[in-house]
Amino acid sequence: MAPTLAPFAARWDAEADRRMALRTPEHLKALMDAQKGYNSARSTAATAKSQRTAARAASKNPLSTVRRAARTADKAARTHRDQAKTKLKAARKDYPATLRARAVQAHAMHAVPGAGISALGWDQAGAWPVAGSLALIAANVAALVIGRRKVAVAVADELSAEERRLVERLDPSYWAQHADERGLVGTVTTPVQVTPAGLVTTVRLDGRWKPSAFKAKHEEIRALLGARTDLRMEIKAGSHGDRAVITLRTRSAADGIDLTGWTPGAPWGVDTVTGEPVQVPLGRRMLIAGTSGSGKSWSTRALLAEGSEYADHRLVVVDPKRVEAINWQHRARTAISIEDVLDVTDELVEEMHERLELIPRGQDVIQISPERPRITVFIDEGAEVIAMAKKTRAKGSKEEPGDPDWSRIMENLSTLARMARAAEIILIWATQKPTMDAKGGIDPQISAQITYRAALALSTSGESRVVFGEDATEKGWHAHELPMPGVAMLRSGPKVQPHPINTRAFSPADVIALPDRPVWRRQESPARSAGASAPAPLRLVKETAPAAEVPAQPTKAPTNREKVAAAIGTGATTVADVATVTGINKGSVSKAVKQLLDAGEVLRSEDGSLSVVTQVGEVSA
């Protein structure tokens, strides 16, 4: 009963204190002066009234001087009396009676008549009038006594100092006494439950409240609890329409779990609410966003290690910034320069089309194997790759073909996002700037195809909506409120809860220490490299050795420079001819030709034709 009656007792005491604060000697003196002035004004008004009556009786002429003077004096006396009465009321308001005196007067108004009725009409009325009055008096006193009780909140010893303070303020007795101060009157909490993820309490709402309106008061609730500004607080609808649930994330169910390093099959992270491991299955197109310093690179490396570990898996890393790509060169195909990025995306598209033709009837995905492995394509950073594709092409000349169409980079990646899942070519797109504007790091066509969406700490709620959808704010996907570094949210379906996840931390040194694994390249046959038109079937650089054995070194695939030299040796004399023979884009051919010219392995004649130097002083015909 104490929490229920606490607001009444608090208001009673507040009014009593207000009245006592006004009962000062100055206000008492003003009241006495006002009472004296009012008594004098009443006496004057009574005298003026009697004089007017006498003048009216003495003369029948209403316009006589005596009657007019008496009438004017009476009117002035009455006006003065009214003014004195107004001043008296103001003085009484400034020096009010005590609340106890008012309570006695109020109860006397019903107790005295009730006692008289009971005494005079006992046989007819019975004892109920006086009994009812006594019950009202007893209820008033009991409400004050119970409402003023200070309930001691039992707090578990294992709670931290912050949790103990929050538990005390979430207790119904404290909440009911202070809710009115924060505009939360009509709400009352239930005893707090301590869970592995923090403190949880259910709030009962009266008819003035809806869960959505209560949620909108999150600032007032935080102030009432005295909670830290950076403490994660969740408010949502309860099990019934008149209830809401407050959750304070003072704890993490992932505390004490070691998430450093990586081993095959290890979870990507641990749910801080449930404590369950979070697995990200291979073969899922994925978006990973996180502002600078959020731990995006450290959190992503475990996924890349898993995607390059097995015999039927290969990894491609596209990193224009170079920093991440160089760590994976011993177990992934890396593309750093714009020419390399265009080459690898061209190869991936060709590989995709070839695989799609191999899918048998009745199946929707190609079966992966060491010969046809799943290829995970990791894009880091998305904004840089998009900027690459917007680079202005250099115009060609008669001798130099100019730059290739760099916009083909994004065309290839969009094609892979739309069509390559069935070919087991999986795109993982990472960016620090998850926006879709001109300088953003997400392409709308690619984003539309992604089903797994992860975000570490972001800058704004708008970025959270871009990553998780337009309902992110409504459903609680507030990645912009996550702490840094290494805490993420993962939305992999409509029923997934927005729980923070402590992700695995994998350092660059850990990546470099990983064992070598086969590197994927779309290899061509010697006839194709020499100028034949028919493409050779896909061959991997090497096979994966058994797990118990050290993997064998891969057979080195011919480089673009070697292919260009071989094509020139077979009779190709211009850059355009070499590009046609080798299937390499013209920009990469021009780059390789320049390297061969600088090394003296190829000569350019006056008419611009190319030839290979076979021996000292000799040129191939």
Curated annotation (Swiss-Prot):
The lineage of its organism: Bacteria, Bacillati, Actinomycetota, Actinomycetes, Kitasatosporales. The chain crosses the membrane at residues 126-146, 564-584. It comes from Streptomyces lividans. ATP binds at G290, T291, S292, G293, S294, G295, K296, S297. One of its GO terms (molecular function) is DNA binding. GO terms for cellular component: plasma membrane. InterPro entries: FtsK/SpoIIIE/SftA, FtsK_dom, P-loop_NTPase. Its main location: membrane. Residues 275-465 form the FtsK domain. It is found in: Cell membrane. PANTHER family: DNA TRANSLOCASE FTSK (PTHR22683:SF41), SPORULATION PROTEIN RELATED (PTHR22683). Major protein required for plasmid transfer. Keywords: ATP-binding, Cell membrane, Membrane, Nucleotide-binding, Plasmid, Transmembrane, Transmembrane helix. It holds the Pfam family FtsK_SpoIIIE. This is Protein Tra. Coiled coil: none annotated. It is a multi-pass membrane protein.
